[in-house]
């Protein structure tokens, strides 16, 4: 079988950042899938699943309520490898265009207090699997160390040279 494009990224060189994972057409509209990479793959511990689940709930809630972007949000969800999240937006977009949106999103998570939206049995399939303190800590770290200091290396995928 052919190797899928996401397996052609050089994960040995991949940094934390915001990357265009793919762009697809749905009808006449382009949708852009972003890799929101919070951890360096295989070089630092993955995100704790409870923290990642909480980030999912809070980020999805924030994004779907953001006055500028809410109509373009298709999906926000965690990566199976636990090193980040995927964001799918309507439009032909690049990574630099959403840095401010991601900064606002992760600032929201980093400063969130109170009940986690959707963390109730009737709303969530695993409502007990949350860790707000770690979600806040990971989000603050991502803002301070990546989003406030990003360069091209944090915005453009390193592809493997085969």
Q: Which residues make up each language-model segment?
A:
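Acidic-enriched, low-complexity/disordered segments with a strong bias for Aspartate over Glutamate
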Residues: 2, 10-12, 24, 35, ...
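Intrinsically disordered, low-complexity regions enriched in small/polar residues
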Residues: 9, 21, 88, 129, ...
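M16/MPP (pitrilysin/insulinase) zinc-metallopeptidase core fold and M16-derived inactive scaffolds
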Residues: 41-97
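General "foldedness" signal
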Residues: 48-50, 68, 99-101, 112, ...
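Active-site-adjacent, His/Asp/Glu-enriched structural segments that form or flank metal-binding
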Residues: 76-149
């Amino acid at each position: 079988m052919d190797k899928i494009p996401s397996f052609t990224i050089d994960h040995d060189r991949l940094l934390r950042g915001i990357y265009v994972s793919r762009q697809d057409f749905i009808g006449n509209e382009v949708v852009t899938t972003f890799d929101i990479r919070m951890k360096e793959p295989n070089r630092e511990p993955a995100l704790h699943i409870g923290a990642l689940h909480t980030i999912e709930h809070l980020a999805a809630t924030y994004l779907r309520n953001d006055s500028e972007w809410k109509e373009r949000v298709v999906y926000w969800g965690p990566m199976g490898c636990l090193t980040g999240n995927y964001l799918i937006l309507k439009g032909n977009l690049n990574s630099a265009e959403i840095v401010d949106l991601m900064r606002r999103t992760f600032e929201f998570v980093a400063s969130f207090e109170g009940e986690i939206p959707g963390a109730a049995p009737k709303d969530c399939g695993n409502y007990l699997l949350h860790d707000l303190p770690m979600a806040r800590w990971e989000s603050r770290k991502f803002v301070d160390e990546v989003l406030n200091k990003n360069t091209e290396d944090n915005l453009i995928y390193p592809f493997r040279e085969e």
